[in-house]
Amino acid sequence: YLDRVRKGTARMGELIDALLKLARIGRAEPGIVDVDLSALAAEVVAGLADAEPGRVVGVAIQPGMHAQGDRTLLQNLLENLLGNAWKFTRGRDDARIEFTRQVAAEGREWFVVRDNGAGFDPDYASKLFKPFQRLHSQEEFPGHGIGLASVKRIVERHGGEIEAEGSPGKGATLRFTL
């Protein structure tokens, strides 16, 4: 019984921390600098790999991706997007995650995080970026349901937009502009 209380208390603390992070995103004026997104993504992935040393994930990060933005907020964004890709590819022998840049026909630059993980039903894509909305059970994939809401807020603070595509069992693709 005491163990359940401890776990519940720890989870509540994590949730409060996540909510505080979400609330802070909208307050401070972002400090805009040149951010090497490729290097930042590599740091995030290294941290994920260190936390699960036995796990093998094929990760491809396009070199030379830069953006103007708040480094701390963009780190939070990549921690959430790449962390989700890492989490939702768990259990796959051939887990793959990509972080690339695409230039659309009109010249707009999109940054893309793609994985071959659990994916999601495209009918529920609009719910992905709302706080506390989860498309997978807590038992299957732990989380608070705040990460993608934070990502959306960060993207919007940078004047960008975000969209998601997915297919159950085939993975997810999240694209954003800054």
What is the meaning of each model-derived region?
Residues V5, G147, V151:
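Short alpha-helical Gxxx[C/S/T] motif in the catalytic ATP-binding
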Residues K7-M12:
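Short alpha-helical segment of the dimerization/phosphotransfer core of two-component systems
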Residues G31-A46, E98-R101:
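A conserved beta-strand-to-alpha-helix junction within the catalytic ATP-binding
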Residues V33, P53-H66, Q102:
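Conserved catalytic submotifs in the C-terminal HATPase_c
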Residues A85-T89:
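Short helix-loop "hinge" at the ATP-lid/N-box region of the Bergerat-fold HATPase_c
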Residues F120-F132:
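Short conserved segment of the HATPase_c
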Residues V155-E156:
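Detector for a conserved hydrophobic position within an alpha-helical segment of the HATPase_c
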